[in-house]
Amino acid sequence: MSADRHYSPIDRFLLQADSALRTLLPFSGQPARPSPAIVEPDGELSEEDTRHIAGLMRINHTGEVCAQALYQGQSLTAKLPEVREAMEEAAEEEIDHLAWCEQRIRQLGSRPSVLNPIFYGLSFGVGAAAGLVSDRVSLGFVAATEDQVCKHLDEHLAQIPQEDRKSRAILEQMRIDEEQHSSNALAAGGLRFPAPVKLGMSLLAKVMTKSTYRI
């Protein structure tokens, strides 16, 4: 998205509404990259493993819903045009993850969390509030959030059996992308959050993971 393009408040509202619909409606997010799972064979999974992996992928899908909302909220209140553009571009990249996770959840015979609209609204508000404080805080929040996501992905990869190469391929590529997003945010001047703040974010993230594993 061009940094020199100017939008009216109504334009921005419509763009935000479009983003919310693309994030929350089933099959509405179109990935720019094909899923890494496409080239991987189907592995034989027990019924118990299938349910567990579906729960983990549902958590990851909701995490991507939160990331979309966070970026969109921040882009709405970012002060510098280049920061706003960076947020919008990052949100577009996260669409890939959103679509990949949903595809895999459906393949495992399950569905995304019904709590997604709630978490979208909460994350959008947090992102907008961070942007109102300062661009540096906003970028720092991105870095800290992506660091938390990487930890969750590592935990999930440790639980997913090697036989499920499709799910593992998705999460491995997501981890690469999320780590890059964190590095980009810090390189752009993001504030490095202190450990107590990160701990608080981690505790809040546990609320999301516990609630969306099954519903």
UniProtKB/Swiss-Prot annotation:
Pathway: Cofactor biosynthesis; ubiquinone biosynthesis. It is an enzyme of class 1 (oxidoreductase). Fe cation 2 binds at residues 94, 146, 178, 181. Its EC number is 1.14.99.60. Keywords: Cell membrane, Iron, Membrane, Metal-binding, Monooxygenase, Oxidoreductase, Ubiquinone biosynthesis. GO terms for molecular function: 3-demethoxyubiquinol 3-hydroxylase activity; metal ion binding; monooxygenase activity. It catalyses: a 5-methoxy-2-methyl-3-(all-trans-polyprenyl)benzene-1,4-diol + AH2 + O2 = a 3-demethylubiquinol + A + H2O. GO terms for cellular component: membrane; plasma membrane. Fe cation 1 binds at residues 64, 94, 97, 178. One of its GO terms (biological process) is ubiquinone biosynthetic process. Its cofactor is Fe cation. The keyword Cell membrane applies. Its main location: membrane. Pfam families: COQ7 (PF03232). NCBIfam families: DMQ_monoox_COQ7 (NF033656). Catalyzes the hydroxylation of 2-nonaprenyl-3-methyl-6-methoxy-1,4-benzoquinol during ubiquinone biosynthesis. PANTHER family: 5-DEMETHOXYUBIQUINONE HYDROXYLASE, MITOCHONDRIAL, COENZYME Q10 BIOSYNTHESIS PROTEIN 7. Belongs to the COQ7 family. This is 3-demethoxyubiquinol 3-hydroxylase. It comes from Pseudomonas aeruginosa (strain ATCC 15692 / DSM 22644 / CIP 104116 / JCM 14847 / LMG 12228 / 1C / PRS 101 / PAO1). The lineage of its organism: Bacteria, Pseudomonadati, Pseudomonadota, Gammaproteobacteria, Pseudomonadales.
